Amino acid sequence: VGLIKENKKHQELFVDICSEKDNLREELKKRTETEKQHMNTIKQLESRIEELNKEVNASRDKLVAQDVTAKNAIQQLHKEMAQRMEQANKKCEEARQEKEAMVMKYVRGEKESLDLRKEKETLEKKLRDANKELEKNTNKIKQLSQEKGRLHQLYETKEGETTRLIREIDKLKEDINSHVIEVKWAQNKLKAEMDSHKETKDKLKETTTKLTQAKEEADQIRKNCQDMIKTYQESEEIKSNELDAKLRVTKGELEKQMQEKSDQLEMHHAKIKELEDLKRTFKEGMDELRTLRTKVKCLEDERLRTEDELSKYKEIINRQKAEIQNLLDKVKIVDQLQEQLQRGKQEIENLKEEVESLNSLISDLQKDIEGSRKRESELLLFTERLTSKNAQLQSESNSLQSQFDKLSCSESQLQSQCEQMKQTNINLESRLLKEEELRKEEVQTLQAELTCRQTEVKALSTQVEELKDELVTQRRKHASSIKDLTKQLQQARRKLDQVENGSYDKEVSSMGSRSSSSGSLNARSSAEDRSPENTGSSVAVDNFPQVDKAMLIERIVRLQKAHARKNEKIEFMEDHIKQLVEEIRKKTKIIQSYILREESGTLSSEASDFNKVHLSRRGGIMASLYTSHPADNGLTLELSLEINRKLQAVLEDTLLKNITLKENLQTLGTEIERLIKHQHELEQRTKKT
């Protein structure tokens, strides 16, 4: 029983080790998968960052082009205003020169005044058009400032995305560190299990010593039984043929028991071989653990590589930040250009004031118009020149409008690209949320599995403790029954020389029933010892991982066949034991009925008759019992009644002991059936798992 327990413990330890190996493999697979997923996400993010960089570069180029075009337009406006100022100055000088000749040309001056009024109106129209163009340019500048704000927002969103990516990278680092800690914890657990395996080896040695002691005790019991059988044979040589047949049957049963014990020894040797095989498999498992450790080292190296890559990505992000700062500097330059535009506006206002002053001069000149009529023809030519210049200015304004339209188209394209970037960012955020939810669900499922396994482990531990307690109680009961049997044998030896033939026969019949009951108990216990060994071996063999699948399948099939054969043998032995018990009961009933029918003297042997004659010749109380007349004066009714009372007390004690033994046998039978059912349930569970 101790060997069975220790074998079960070894098997449970190996099963736990194998399950932990499988769990570690599954965890490594999951980690590799998660690392692959993280690498894929990192690659996707890298590609996305490259695309964003390309878009940023394109936007930069567009901004540079827009800045260049705006600068060119401003320079052209400045040139045009300078030309106009030069022309106005020239006109003023010409007007001053013409003042001297205006006196002579008063008649022509009136006509020229009318023409000048017309020219004034045209100039006012031109000023209005110029103001409108300035307003348009201011609106364009406002739109450019709005675009600048949008670009700032885009840069800020990109910076937020970079910070999120950095946080995700930090989370991945923390996950990798947690996985490394779990691997170390598993290694420590394996070391503890190795220490427990050493303790189990020491327990095996102790159990072998206990087995040798038990064998010696069994040999002594056999010798005592053989001595008893010899004494019975010497005293009952002239009994009936039925008793001889019973003795032969008992001898056959004893031989069968001897054979069963030899089979048990063979099973013990087989178990020792199986333990050696288990040691080999344990060594193989240790080699596999070493390989797993090497894999863990490789994973750590990969983790270091990933950390280096993350540092590189951080450097890239810092570079991008520097580029963003450069862009902000460029935006500041654009602000400076806006300030320059405002200055140009102020200059235009100053020019307007100068124009008003010129208008005042024109009003002064109107007084001198009378002398300016002579230059009508020249003024007409001047008007023609002004019309040509107006046409040129209109063509230039049309070109500026076309440039403005182009800039508006580029702005619309940039806005569409910004919207696409926003949509891609939203999609990425939704994907990240989905991945987080999936990982949370995986964690919850793993926690539920852990709780279920912990409950199963607790239930199995409670069952093991209950089985241990039941085995201890069975051992105690067996020890008490053996003690009772030894006491009864000693009492029978003592009473062989004192008790009469009738009482002798009754005691012999009771002893025969006891021996048969003890034989049935041994048979059942041997069957029970075999069944858990078989189940244990099957469980131990079924739980060997790390071997080729084909070898595992072949070995499982062989072990299942051997297990089925052993189960058939056990069932056959149980049926055979039941049949033997039924036959013994029938024979006991026949013997009891035969003894009740026949007289005590007919069943006695010739040796007992010679003993009776010898005692009757000697005289005394026993002689008066064996003869019809009193041979001793000391024998009285009181003495005879006391003797009868003592004999009745002995009979009552034997009957009570027989009843208790029957009850113990019944309880043992029920417990054995319960243990067999429990064993079958455990086998079914192991097969299902």
From Swiss-Prot:
Comp. bias intervals (Basic and acidic residues): 494-508
Keyword list, A-Z: Coiled coil, Phosphoprotein
Residue stretches spanning the membrane: none
InterPro entries: CCDC186
Location of Phosphoserine modifications: 531
Bias (Low complexity): 509-525
Location of region: Disordered: 493-541
Cellular component annotations (GO), alphabetically ordered: trans-Golgi network
Coiled coil ranges: 20-503, 550-594, 646-685
GO molecular function: small GTPase binding
GO biological process: vesicle cytoskeletal trafficking
Descriptive protein name: Coiled-coil domain-containing protein 186
